[in-house]
Regions:
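Vicinal oxygen chelate
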Residues: 2, 14-17, 61-62, 71, ...
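Cationic, low-complexity basic patches in intrinsically disordered or flexible, solvent-exposed regions
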Residues: 9-12
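N-terminal beta-strand motif that seeds the catalytic metal site of vicinal oxygen chelate
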Residues: 14-34, 91-100, 150-151
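A cross-kingdom feature marking solvent-exposed beta-strand/loop segments within repeated
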Residues: 17, 21-23, 45-57, 77-94, ...
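Short, structured motif recognition centered on aromatic/hydrophobic residues
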Residues: 22-29, 36-39, 63, 70-73, ...
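C-terminal "cap" of GNAT-fold acetyltransferases
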Residues: 55-69
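Long, charged/polar, surface-exposed segments that mediate recognition or autoinhibition
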Residues: 89-90, 103-111
Length: 151
């Protein structure tokens, strides 16, 4: 359908946004303190939170970038997902995380669409958020995290 200005119009009923916003970008690092020195000291991104997330096998730090965050991830061991990522690919972009208000609905929508999930049910993330990951094959080659913040 074309609008009055001749541009293509998409019917809003066809677009049901699953994600509210980009929550953070995750970066795998071998040395969290060294990475913090770069991101805080050089890039000027203040660290706002740091914690060990045993369930995911990482020590993580969140840095403010406007309304979003960068999440630095140091593996707690070589056999963790981030440890395996570092061994295979080295330090760098690990995932993109999108925020939702209802993670169960988002996961159901992914299942209904036939997307390959890493997590069928949410698990605990940083700051007691609820998180689940989509396999990169389901999202254009990018590891995708769905995040429902703790309330």
């Amino acid at each position: 359908m074309r609008g009055a200005d001749g541009t293509e119009q998409v019917q809003s009923s066809l677009l049901r946004r699953m994600f509210d916003r980009i929550d953070h970008v995750g970066i795998a690092v071998e040395d969290l303190d060294g990475a913090l020195a770069l991101f805080e000291g050089t890039f000027g991104m203040p660290a706002v939170h740091r914690e060990t997330v045993d369930e995911q096998g990482v020590e993580a730090a969140l840095l403010d970038v406007g309304e979003n965050h960068v999440e630095l991830l140091r593996p707690l061991g070589a056999d963790t997902p981030v440890g395996k990522f570092l061994a295979k690919r080295g330090p760098g972009l690990h995932h993109v995380a999108y925020q939702v208000t209802d993670i169960e609905s988002a996961l159901q929508r992914c299942k209904d669409a036939g997307l390959r999930l890493i997590d069928e049910t949410p698990r605990t993330g940083i700051r007691n958020s609820r998180v689940a990951f989509l396999h990169p094959a389901a999202s254009g080659g990018v590891l995708t995290e769905i995040v429902e913040p703790a309330h």
